[in-house]
């Protein structure tokens, strides 16, 4: 579920007529984004100009997003990403704002990871990794975490990329943005086919 606002009504009518939207705000309820449970997005989109050309549907001057992912949502997401064993691997998530780490605690393991900006998205860089009763190479676990976070935070359209990430007492907050982005045609990206 999401809510959107376009400004006050008289100005909105003018924006629709001119196909130039100066300020759009969107906020999700915080239930889920992609496969990430407990994730909320607050978007501010500025200077949208709709104009059909062979290569685009128009342009977006600026898009800024604040993405909040709760500790409980991180736990549920990791559990869902590892069917059957998920609850054993991650039974709780504890955040440590002082050192910017997230601790994934399970019956069989304890992983301390630091969320970082990597490429255009985010990664959880393993700081400490302990297992009980079995041995897994740290590289294997790191690779699995990278695939998981990549599927959630990379490959956004419009050149949207991660700018920063911060661990808070309740989860993780990240900032994503793009500037002067061309809106793809429906053929280039089906998500934009009805613009």
Put a short name on every predicted segment:
Residues 100-102, 122, 172-173:
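Hydrophobic residues embedded in beta-strands of well-ordered beta-sheets
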Residues 98, 107-109, 159:
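Residues that act as N-cap/strand-start positions at coil-to-secondary-structure junctions
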Residues 93-94, 113-117, 164-165:
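A structural signal for short hydrophobic beta-strand segments in well-ordered beta-sheet cores
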Residues 136-195:
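Extracytoplasmic/luminal low-complexity segments enriched in Pro/Gly and acidic/polar residues
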Residues 77-89, 96, 118-161:
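Extended amphipathic ligand-handling, pore-lining, and cofactor/metal-binding catalytic surfaces
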Residues 2-84, 92, 97-101:
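N-terminal beta-strand/beta-hairpin edge segment
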Residues 8-10, 30-32, 45-49, 69-73, ...:
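Beta-strand elements of well-folded, non-transmembrane domains
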């Amino acid at each position: 579920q999401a809510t959107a606002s376009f400004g006050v009504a008289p100005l909105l009518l003018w924006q629709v007529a001119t196909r130039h939207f100066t300020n759009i705000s969107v906020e999700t309820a915080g239930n889920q984004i992609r496969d990430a449970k407990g994730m909320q997005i607050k978007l501010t989109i500025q200077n949208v100009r709709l104009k059909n050309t062979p290569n685009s549907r128009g342009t977006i001057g600026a898009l800024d997003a604040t993405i909040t992912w709760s500790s409980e949502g991180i736990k549920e997401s990791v559990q869902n990403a590892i069917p059957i064993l998920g609850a054993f691997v991650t039974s709780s998530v504890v955040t440590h704002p002082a050192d910017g780490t997230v601790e994934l605690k399970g019956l069989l393991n304890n992983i301390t990871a630091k969320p970082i900006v990597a490429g255009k998205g985010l990664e959880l860089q393993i700081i400490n990794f302990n297992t009980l009763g079995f041995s897994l190479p740290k590289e294997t676990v790191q690779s699995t975490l990278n695939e998981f976070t990549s599927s959630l935070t990379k490959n956004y359209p419009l050149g949207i990329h991660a700018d920063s990430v911060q661990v808070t007492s309740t989860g993780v907050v990240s900032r994503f943005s793009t500037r002067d982005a061309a809106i793809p045609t429906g053929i280039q990206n089906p998500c934009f086919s009805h613009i």
